[in-house]
UniProtKB/Swiss-Prot annotation:
Sequence ranges assigned to domain Radical SAM core in this UniProt record: 67-281
Annotated protein name in UniProt: Lipoyl synthase
Catalyzed reactions: [[Fe-S] cluster scaffold protein carrying a second [4Fe-4S](2+) cluster] + N(6)-octanoyl-L-lysyl-[protein] + 2 oxidized [2Fe-2S]-[ferredoxin] + 2 S-adenosyl-L-methionine + 4 H(+) = [[Fe-S] cluster scaffold protein] + N(6)-[(R)-dihydrolipoyl]-L-lysyl-[protein] + 4 Fe(3+) + 2 hydrogen sulfide + 2 5'-deoxyadenosine + 2 L-methionine + 2 reduced [2Fe-2S]-[ferredoxin]
UniProt keyword annotations, A-Z: 4Fe-4S, Cytoplasm, Iron, Iron-sulfur, Metal-binding, S-adenosyl-L-methionine, Transferase
Length: 314
């Protein structure tokens, strides 16, 4: 059997990554389990009716706080992604056939859990003619129809920057349209070979021009410098991006990119203050922050200070 050149390259990359042992976490990379009444009730419900959330399946350290706020995240499109990012724990491979009933099931899960706010994310589906745009848009509409008071945040891939695909997704009108840049230009191709930095910025610009509240994320500890982080934050703000989260990279396995550096908590404070100075409406940074952490609160904060459609000077 002939192995495709791209597959060979990825195998070599994973072999090289595996030469570096899993890094020992510093003392500030820890969280306390605070199991309040809302979390406990939701946990029991999820077990009783066999629901599946990214929060549990990814072992998110913030699940206690988010579930206490009645917020949860769902992954759509299957468990195989057509792209490979060197920080992501989702497997790369040939996805299963499109499940057209998935939007209904997600909407019913949101209803059953009584969520106030939900984040929907998914895998890249370059195998589909529309890149999965129908699935993302239909899931948002299904949630809104069944749960009119629930806020919906949609975290999307770039759909190869195709305007028609993006328009279909934007027309579903999520409360927040998120697309994560994740890292800085110098190492972008190494970390996210199937994406481009500028195209990701263009997706955010297009979403902002469509009148949506927009959001992105930067992962630190992949080899970036402080100046590069500040430049990337400025680039995001120039697109009109409203909300940004700044996070620490936690290596999923030895196959993934090694942790280059553990960013100290005080550095996150400095980056957060810098981002606020740039004019982001909502900023959250920290070693255990994830892009969907406190998503509902960040949206409310941004919506309260932002005028939809306002242009940002470039």
């Amino acid at each position: 059997m002939t192995v495709a050149p791209e597959d060979c390259r990825l195998l070599r990359l994973e072999v090289r990554n595996a030469q570096t042992p899993i890094e020992r976490k510093p003392p500030w990379i820890k969280t306390r389990a605070r199991m309040g009444p809302e979390y406990t009730a939701l946990k029991n419900l999820v077990r009783r009716v066999a629901l599946h959330t990214v929060c549990e399946e990814a072992g998110c350290p913030n699940i206690f706080e988010c579930w206490e706020d009645r917020e949860a995240t769902f992954l759509i499109g299957g468990d195989q992604c057509t792209r490979r990012c060197d920080f992501c724990q989702i497997d790369t491979g040939k996805p299963a056939a499109l499940d057209r009933d998935e939007p209904r099931r997600v909407a019913e899960s949101v209803q059953t859990m009584g969520l106030r706010y939900t984040t929907v994310t998914g895998v890249a589906r370059d195998d589909l003619p529309d890149g999965g745009a129908w699935l993302y848009a239909t899931t948002v509409r299904a949630i809104k129809e069944l749960n009119p008071s629930t806020g919906v945040e949609l975290l999307i891939p770039d759909f190869n920057g195709q305007p028609a695909r993006l328009a279909e997704v934007f027309d579903s009108r999520p409360q927040v349209l998120a697309h994560n840049v994740e890292t800085v230009p110098r190492i972008f191709k190494r970390i996210r070979p199937a994406f481009t930095y500028q195209r990701s910025l263009d997706v955010l610009t297009a979403a902002r021009e469509a009148g949506l509240v927009t959001k992105s994320n930067l992962i630190l500890g992949l080899g970036e410098t402080a100046d590069e982080v500040r430049t990337a934050l400025a680039d995001l703000r120039k697109t009109g991006c409203d909300i940004v989260t700044i996070t620490q990279y936690l290596r999923p396995s030895m196959r993934h990119h090694p942790v280059e550096r553990w960013v100290r908590p005080e550095e996150f404070v400095e980056y957060t203050q810098y981002a606020e100075g740039l004019g982001f409406s909502g900023v959250l940074g920290g070693p255990l922050v994830r892009s969907s952490y406190r998503a509902g609160r960040l949206y409310e904060q941004a919506a309260g200070t932002r005028t939809v459609g306002t242009s940002v000077s470039r």
